[in-house]
């Protein structure tokens, strides 16, 4: 299978042996608007991206808590146009989202705040340039309509492999994660 591992930040991408979402798709930083989505670069770079998108089987995205709604919708739109099965959600590419939504939130600048606001209208249609109800990935049109299967991992591995870390420390981390003291 042709698998691409992506992350929101460069450091996380290095840690998982992948690339940033922006680098792989050629997105500019900032708000992703449908009216501005296009493959950028030289003609050769653009064709290389098209070939890469058409050959994809799966994408794994780490740090899902930082993945904004506009960015996930942009990934879906590009793959629907240039993926292996145009017109299908994510162009027929299997998408795996990983991470803890209680970790770091999506980053929204002051200039981008107006794009993320509560909406009372029909949420079953893409809204794009009209905004999203929140910056969280799960409020993207692509996620709400993508049929994602949610799994909750409950066993902690990282702290259990370190003999110096006790159960009290692991419980303390869990309380912090949930905003309890």
Annotate the PLM regions.
Residues 1-181:
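Conserved ATP-binding/catalytic motifs of P-loop helicase motor domains
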């Amino acid at each position: 299978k042709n698998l691409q591992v992506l992350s929101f930040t460069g450091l996380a991408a290095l840690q998982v042996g992948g690339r940033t979402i922006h680098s792989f798709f050629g997105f500019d930083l900032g708000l992703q608007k449908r009216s501005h989505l296009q493959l950028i670069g030289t003609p050769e770079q653009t064709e290389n991206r098209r070939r890469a998108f058409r050959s994809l089987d799966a994408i794994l995205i780490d740090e899902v808590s930082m993945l904004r709604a506009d960015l996930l919708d942009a990934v879906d739109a590009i793959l629907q146009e240039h993926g292996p099965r145009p017109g299908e959600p994510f162009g027929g590419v299997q998408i795996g989202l990983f991470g803890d939504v209680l970790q770091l939130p999506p980053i929204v600048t002051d200039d981008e705040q107006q794009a993320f606001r509560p909406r009372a209208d029909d949420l079953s249609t893409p809204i794009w340039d009209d905004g999203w109800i929140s910056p969280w990935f799960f409020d993207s049109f692509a996620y709400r309509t993508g049929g994602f299967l949610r799994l909750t991992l409950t066993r902690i591995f990282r702290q259990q492999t370190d003999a110096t870390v006790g159960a009290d420390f692991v419980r303390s981390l869990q309380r912090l994660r949930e905003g309890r003291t």
